[in-house]
Amino acid sequence: CYGKSLPNGKTYKQEMLEKIPLDLSRVHFVGSLPYGLYLKVIQASDVHIYLTRPFVLSWSMIESLSTGCLIVGSDTSPVREVIEDGENGLLADFFSPKQVADRVDEVLEHPTRMAEIREKARQTVLERYALSDMLGKHLELINQVANRTLTPTIGRETKPSLTLSKF
């Protein structure tokens, strides 16, 4: 979806299935879905595994949180901006498949214990990312950039008057 095509012409799914033996009765490749059906899949999921290197945070993580789907995410800066380990999701070392698997096991083995984390995940989105709040802030940011009134912050110690991290 985001990367280059493989030089051998295979899809990443084909490449992975050739290298990793998976129980396909337990792993679902749903492909592209209409938005309403996509949300139903997330709502039916026990866990959303979100691994990313330092990059921009994907909307899929915020949407998963909004449905109360529990996130096991990589302990990387974009994920830590949203997930507080043990509060509204779980973090694992990006470079440790065992730690990721252990965190997923923790979710699946203790569904009752995870209920509060799921609720806090949803609350995080309602409190910090609600469209009714974000729209005005985004328009303000656009106006500041367009009018050149946004204080430059690169290389400065002071905090800007408006940043996306506040949202």
Predicted regions and their residues:
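Nucleotide-activated donor-binding/catalytic signature segment of Leloir-type glycosyltransferases, i.e.
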Residues: K13-L33
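Short alpha-helical donor nucleotide-sugar binding micro-motif in glycosyltransferases
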Residues: S32, K40-S45
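Short alpha-helical segment that forms part of, or immediately flanks, the ligand-binding pocket
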Residues: L39, S58-S66, R80-E81, E87
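Aromatic "clamp/platform" in nucleotide-sugar-dependent glycosyltransferases that forms part
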Residues: R53
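Short hydrophobic beta-strand element within catalytic cores of glycosyltransferases
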Residues: L70-G73
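Conserved acidic donor-binding segment of nucleotide-sugar-dependent glycosyltransferases
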Residues: D85-G86, L90-P97, E106-P111
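A short, well-ordered alpha-helix in the C-terminal region of glycosyltransferases
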Residues: Q99, E106, R113-E127, M134-E140
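C-terminal alpha-helical cap of glycosyltransferases
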Residues: L131-F167
